[in-house]
Every structure is written in C-alpha cells, then in structure tokens.
Amino acid sequence: MNSPKMTLEQELAAAVAIVRIGLDRIRDAACRTEAVGPHAAALQALYDPAKPDAGVLAFVADVIGTITVSVTEVDHDDIERVTELLDEAKGHVQDSTGDRIRHALALLEPLLQRCEECGQQKPDVDVMADPFSTALYPEETDHRQIPLCPPCATKRFEES
C-alpha cells in the first residue's frame, strides 16, 4: 500500500511549521518570567558558546552548507556566485549572529544566580527549599531556601 506523497511545497510548509513551533517554545520558555536565567538558557539554545555546533543556529548553518554542496551539481553559469552567497550566509548565521549572542550572554552572566553548592552561575539555578533538610524532615514547613542548580539539588537530595 502506497501512502500519498506530499508535494515539495507541502513538505517544506510542514517543515517550516515544525521549526516555528520549536522556536515558539524557545521564546515562550524565555519570556514567561522576568528572571534572567530562562532568557540566557533560551539564547544558549540558539547559540551556546561552549557548544557552538549544537544550537539552532548551527543547525541552520548546516542546512545552508548542505544545500550549498548540493547546488554545485546544477549546471549553470551563476552557480559559483550562488555558492559564494550561500557560504557567506552560512558564516553570518553562525559567526556573526552567534558572536552577538555570545556577547549578550557574557553581559547577562553576572545577573545569573550562583549555585550555593558548586558556586557556578548558570541559567538553571533556582531558589528552592533545601532538598537535604526537606528529605530528612518532610513534616517541617520552614526549610531554608537556597539557590541550587539541578545537579547540585539532586546531589543534596541523594546525600540526605
């Protein structure tokens, strides 16, 4: 049994819709609060200086690069210019845009909360009831509130 094929236009429209949903999720995660952490985390999802090949911009650059290589098979006088333009576009996506996001993240970093356990300033540090005392004394209601990143919160809970 053959399933109906989508036209190229339908296939690309579906792909664009999926990308739009993903970008909407990134934007919503950042903007649901005034806290700096979610904003920085969303920017890192777009471009993470520690992992420049893993963010959204890297994926966009990769698609442009693959299309650039593929289009070289087209026999036309202007293909060399097309590939030059696409190479420039790829560079702008990851280098120029990524560099600006990297600078923005560097400016936001001092505003991030510092984890009380590991001392690092990370976007995912959250102020919470101490997992150690909460696990040992669940009946208590007045646990100390401390800023912890998820790995340190888990570690404190496991130590209880």
Task: For the regions a language model picked out, list residue spans one by one.
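C-terminal end-of-chain micro-motif
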Residues: M1-S3, E159-S160
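Short, non-ligating residues that shape and space the ligands of small metal-coordination modules
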Residues: D124-V125, K155-E159
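Hydrophobic alpha-helical segments that drive targeting, anchoring, or assembly
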Residues: N2-L108, C115, Y137, A153
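Cys/His-coordinated zinc-binding microdomains
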Residues: G119, P150-A153
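Extracellular interaction modules
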Residues: H143-P147
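Short recognition patches in nucleic-acid-associated and regulatory proteins
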Residues: L112-D142
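Cys/His-enriched low-complexity segments
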Residues: L148-P151, E158
